Amino acid sequence: MTDFLQDENLIAPPRTVRIDFDDGSFALRSPMALKPYARCIGEWIERWAHETPDALAFAERDETGEGWRKLDYRALRHAVGAVAQALLDMNLPQGQPVVILSDNAIDHAVLMLAAMHIGRTACSLSSAYSRMAKDPSRLHGMLQALKPGLIYASDAKVYGGSLAGCGVEAVTVFSRNAEAHPGAMAFERLLAAKETPAVMQAFADVLPDTHAKYLLTSGSTGKPKIVINTHRMLCANQQMMAQTWRFLTREAPVLVDWLPWSHTFGANHNLNMVLCHGGALYIDEGRPAPGLIEKTVRNLREVKPTLLFNVPRGFDMLLPFLEADDALAAEVFSRLRLAFYAAAALAPSTWQRLEAVAARVRPTRPLWLTTSWGATETSPAITSAHWKLDGAGCIGAPLPGLELKFVPNGEKLEMRVKGVSVFPGYRDAPRETAQAFDEEGYYRIGDAGFLANPAQPAQGVIFNGRVAEDFKLSSGTWVSVGTLRVKLVSLLAPHAQDVVLTGHDRDEIGMLVFPSPQGAALAPDALHERIAGMLRALRDEGAGSSQCPACALVLAEPPSLDAGEITDKGYINQRAVLTRRATDVARLHASGDAQVVRPA
């Protein structure tokens, strides 16, 4: 793997330019100029249908659950053309998107790509709002804001009920049981349409600044907003990655991926990377959850992907299987170029365990663990760590075509970004759009960072949490929530799913603990002692008030999706938890509550 990372034909060497400004701020940019990129996403489909028509594009488990339903690029282009024609025939109102409610699937992909092929905007909403939420009001609010011309879901019997009373008039389409929903259309009818020259006429009219997708922000920092993603943004971002991961242009990627297309990681980073380079995406019906992670393990064993993308919780749940079965680990890692994490910070213990498994089953090829940093508003990647990292924390250096600015903000350096892959704004939200950019046109992403080595900016940026998450103790000492949270979850591994920190304007830090399945399986006293022991160890090591919680409370109720406390990717909205559980916060900092854990 060392040779791989040192081969400039496969990986771009780390090079970064620093520009200092008179006000104490500075910016980083890549010395590489951004090369030309596709006009629109549909150009990728057209290219591979012509150049490699028999190459696999998508695969999903068939109805038996044993085999795979597969679609090559020839069949994908045929299906996209048919569905695009059907959409044109419907004469849907201009400006009204195609909204998709259900999980990743081939039909989902075909409809999304068909809409974009003819300049119609697509929007995938998290299926959790339809299937897992007890209250459909959030879904209804999103639909009313989006004003869709067409709503699709995989199964009318599963998703149809959530549409009742949504207050939106739109064509409804289902792949299964359409007859169970009044007025609905079967997806088969769209696939049966005969493509006419009108499809390619509409395709020719798609411009780089045409809206390709709407994605809703995760809500990890506030109320979800509708983010405009243009074709220019998405195509440019894949070109940026291709100039950094140069091997992508030589080796069509093979992915096994569960990450939802309602989020930028799964949709714009992973799915678009496959389509841009003529690769294959095996849609993983598994999830990082008990009873579902086993499906992911099976799929990884069968497919042996070349790239592995996941959130930290996904790696945490995979590790016990890989650690217990060397044969499985050897198969999963046999073709793997890299393991990539994003969307949340990776605990140091997880990093070390992944490296240890790889060292055992492929000792001559160390596992390249890497990451990137970005947002829904940035297509998503802003940075890439395209060199060997010694551990978690570094988010890499800016990609070609982007400028990353560091602005002093209190105790931190706030990061802001400008470039071709940054969004033009939020849909129908001029005030929020104006607030998102500073006077020089940099997007205010809200994250903080600092240089790993100020004298050598090419060594990358260290992520330093959210600017708005941090708080001061009554002593005036700042608490860096993002950094401390990752440390605490790692120290409590594997017994904590996540923690939320408290202590704003108080004398001490408190910690609300969401136990993991392993933590919940312990007797309450044993879990309390585990937490108390960790707090004692931190205190005895001399950790200061900003680095050592003085109390903890284990929460019996898991984070609520309906209340916005957690996203379907598994990361916590700190603000929502603190607001909803204000009573628990008060208990935590009061004296005399027997359930509050202290180091003693």
Give, region by region, the residue ranges found by the protein language model.
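N-lobe entry segment of adenylate-forming
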Residues: 1-71, 75-90, 94, 118, ...
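Conserved ATP-dependent adenylate/AMP-binding module captured primarily in the ANL superfamily
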Residues: 129-164, 195, 237-256, 289-306
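Conserved AMP-binding A3 loop
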Residues: 69-74, 203-204, 212-239
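Conserved ATP-binding/catalytic segment of the ANL
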Residues: 413-473, 597-599
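Gly/Ser/Thr-rich phosphate-binding loop
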Residues: 189, 277, 297, 306-310, ...
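Conserved pre-ATP/AMP-binding loop-to-beta segment of ANL
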Residues: 53-54, 173-175, 182-216, 223, ...
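Conserved AMP-binding/adenylation subdomain of ANL enzymes
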Residues: 235-254, 262-330
